Amino acid sequence: MSYQGKKNIPRITSDRLLIKGGRIVNDDQSFYADIYMEDGLIKQIGDNLIVPGGVKTIEANGKMVMPGGIDVHTHFQMPYKGMTTVDDFFQGTKAALAGGTTMIIDHVVPEPESSLTEAYEKWREWADGKSCCDYALHVDITHWNDSVKQEVQNLSKEKGVNSFMVYMAYKDLYQVSNTELYEIFTCLGELGAIAQVHAENGDIIAQEQARMLEMGITGPEGHVLSRPEELEAEAVFRAITVASQTNCPLYVTKVMSKSAADLISQARKKGNVVFGEPITASLGIDGTHYWSKNWAKAAAFVTSPPLSPDPTTPDYINSLLASGDLQLSGSAHCTFSTAQKAIGKDNFTAIPEGTNGVEERMSVIWDKAVATGKMDENQFVAVTSTNAAKIFNLYPRKGRIAVGSDSDLVIWDPDAVKIVSAKNHQSVAEYNIFEGMELRGAPLVVICQGKIMLEDGNLHVTQGAGRFIPCSPFSDYVYKRIKARRKMADLHAVPRGMYDGPVFDLTTTPKGGTPAGSTRGSPTRPNPPVRNLHQSGFSLSGTQVDEGVRSASKRIVAPPGGRSNITSLS
């Protein structure tokens, strides 16, 4: 599938670049070599390369050179209740590049009952005009019927979308039923697409929200109190179950709790094709801030599923990410201003949900996982770039340093230290949930489409230069096992002769019996006769009809060795 063209959008001219003296880090190996790039592609890798004149040389001085990051979960320029997130595609992708990310995958969120295709085209128009780096799109399924099914099929086959998200929460807005979940997973599995889920039990959340408000809890702490992690875990388990029944690969977005992460880990060990996506927030910070006395600060952390109030959760999730039980990372970058958040100042259920994280994602993971010895540099590349490229069928064009791959590269300094502050981040949001954190590891140089985007701490970006990258269905990384299981899972009826015995006539149901066609009771157990209360056996004389009949609960004492009345069956 080729790149999609755009009209009247400035194109960047790729530089001829030579990176010398760097240590190339892929997900499976690290080695020293030089890299020559031209026309936005990697042309040569090796020592003593022969390159044309006029090449710009970048001295890596032994620093790591790795594939540019891929942020698989963003919400740039997203409309919400008459508002729009403060970071549009220009500001959002600019922040991404500042943190070492050279491609993002944004979520298209159609209004309920509206066209998925029209929403997709709207997102394309916004992103084509403003994105500074390459991008792809997920499409969220916010309602379900035959018309939506046809749109999903068209988006998958014609529009370069291979992932669709459904919501198990947001009752009466986006939430799908279990039956719809089954139908959607079946459809996506047939298309070779990836089923993503926002996993929370929306029915229970609605009840808990009402209970919190009745108790007078209206602040941001009500958000986490009404969404305990058990509700995330229950939905994850349910989604895994439905995905297994439909033989559809499952992708759990925003893994926020230990319980949810454990369920994904256990399911993978049992052979389920399921992927888990923790986000910058769940990897870098906890939910104790919901109880801050400063309402604006507490509200800045409101996202769903909520951050866990257990302060050991980020370390735990980083460990599972390092071990491969969770496979990749996103940021779920969805920023609202404090004034926008304040529409819920008297009711936590009205606070717009979302946090920052696109710029901080790679440094947070390096600081929390690599610098602490949980994962090595190759695993870091896997969870920030390569696994995403494999899952969404972008590999090896993205996510790898190899001849023929896109020249999206990052020269990474593991010793660099930066202190996060809203005063100097690229996001428009006036608050940063990682404020004051000292993070080890940062990009020195960022190259996207063969063009230097970040150098010496200065950004050089071009609005609208980002390309839409279509994602083809049936990714081998995702579907190889699914295809094999389909061949093995063909169901066949048992060959047997025709039954020619007696058949009970349901039309002659006795008076007082269960009406024909009733589904009450077990279909395999005959229903006991219904007692006619007008023909009661109770007598005032003291002698009853059932006198002498042993009660089922009455114990009979048998002699040693037991008492037998069984006759021979021979």
Swiss-Prot record:
Modified residues (Phosphotyrosine): 431, 499
Biased amino acid composition, Polar residues: 506-524, 533-544
Keyword Cytoplasm attributed: yes
Keyword vocabulary terms for this entry: Cell projection, Cytoplasm, Phosphoprotein
One MF annotation (Gene Ontology) recorded for this entry: hydrolase activity, acting on carbon-nitrogen (but not peptide) bonds, in cyclic amides
Free-text function comment from the UniProt entry: Necessary for signaling by class 3 semaphorins and subsequent remodeling of the cytoskeleton. Plays a role in axon guidance, neuronal growth cone collapse and cell migration.
Protein name (database record): Dihydropyrimidinase-related protein 3
Native source species: Rattus norvegicus (Rat)
